[in-house]
A protein has these predicted regions:
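Transmembrane alpha-helix boundary and packing residues in multipass membrane permease domains
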Residues: 33, 37, 48-49, 66, ...
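Residue-level signal for short hydrophobic patches within transmembrane helices
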Residues: 23-42, 46, 68-75, 151, ...
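Short alpha-helical transmembrane segments in multi-pass integral membrane proteins
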Residues: 1-33, 87-154, 200-256
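Helix-terminus/linker motif at the lipid-water interface of multi-pass membrane proteins
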Residues: 42-61, 129-136, 192-203, 256
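Hydrophobic transmembrane alpha-helices of multi-pass small-molecule transporters
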Residues: 71-74, 186-190, 220-224
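Small-residue-rich hydrophobic transmembrane alpha-helices
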Residues: 48, 59-119, 156-175
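Alpha-helical transmembrane segments of multi-pass membrane transporters/permeases
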Residues: 110, 165-192, 206-209, 213
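Small-residue hotspots at the loop-to-helix junctions and early N-terminal turns
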Residues: 56-67, 142, 146, 209
Length: 257
């Protein structure tokens, strides 16, 4: 029986080494992505946990609002995934200006859409909330809660699209850290605004909504800083769009389809 020669053994060792290296790199990308998604979703879960110490109607009102906001988040995330693919493709071919263009076009169109959602839910949230409850008191609490959290929709969109940009560049850790910081802000402000702190009286469910909006705004601001800061920003060295409010139909078509 003929044994394997030195050359064959070397090839096998190299193949095993490459396989291990590839697996390690995949884990380094996937694990932060999973954690980032968990942290994004957990912002509402943390709020729910804190609201859980309040009255039953408060819990119910917050719960039915979360059903709507989570549905919208799935939409934002779906569009962002399309942007991530295109950004990664452009980055792989060295077209960093295109990366910035794709991100900014996606952000612009999503902000336009989210503005429509904000207006509708601010003035007529009862149309949608009525599907989940018929209790007048719960619906009133839910409508007032919704009127506050709609102001955080823009921050949520900015964070989602910024995550698409970072992940398209192969950086999955930065969005995870931003999401973790957002949750920390939500917890700190949540306890203070819900239950009160010192001379500050607790605002109950509306304190929870305010804390969530503050946390999402903080996260959005942090993302924008990391994208556009001088010298170290993700888009440093790239030229901005000539017209910010110009919509490139072909670019948007690729993202949304």
């Amino acid at each position: 029986m003929l044994g394997r020669g030195p050359t064959s053994l070397c090839k096998t060792e190299v193949l095993v080494y490459k396989t291990k290296t590839i697996k390690r790199e995949i884990y380094h990308i996937i694990i932060p992505m999973i954690l980032e998604n968990i942290l994004q979703i957990s912002a509402n879960l943390v709020t729910t946990a804190m609201v859980g110490r309040l009255l039953a109607n408060d819990i119910a009102a917050q719960g039915i609002c979360v059903r709507i906001t989570d549905t919208l988040w799935v939409f934002y995330k779906g569009v962002a995934i399309g942007a991530t693919v295109l950004i990664a493709k452009a980055y792989g071919t060295g077209k960093k200006e295109d990366c910035r263009k794709i991100m900014e076009q996606t952000l612009l169109t999503e902000l336009i859409l989210v503005f429509v959602f904000q207006v509708v839910l601010f003035f007529r949230a009862d149309i949608f909330l009525g599907f989940f409850s018929k209790d007048a008191e719960i619906l009133m609490l839910a409508q007032n809660y919704m009127k506050i959290i709609v102001f955080g929709f823009s921050g949520c969109v900015i964070m989602t699209v910024a995550t698409a940009a970072f992940q398209g560049y192969g950086d999955t850790k930065t969005p995870m850290m931003v999401a973790a910081a957002m949750n920390l802000v939500n917890i700190i402000f949540g306890f203070g605004l819900i239950f009160g702190f010192g001379p500050l009286k607790g605002m109950g469910i509306f304190g929870a909504a305010t804390a969530l909006v503050l946390a999402q705004t903080f996260g959005a601001g942090m993302d924008l800083f990391l994208l556009y800061r001088k010298k170290k920003g993700l888009f440093f060295g790239t030229d901005p769009q000539k017209k910010w409010f110009y919509i490139d139909k072909s670019c948007i078509y690729e993202v949304y389809t």
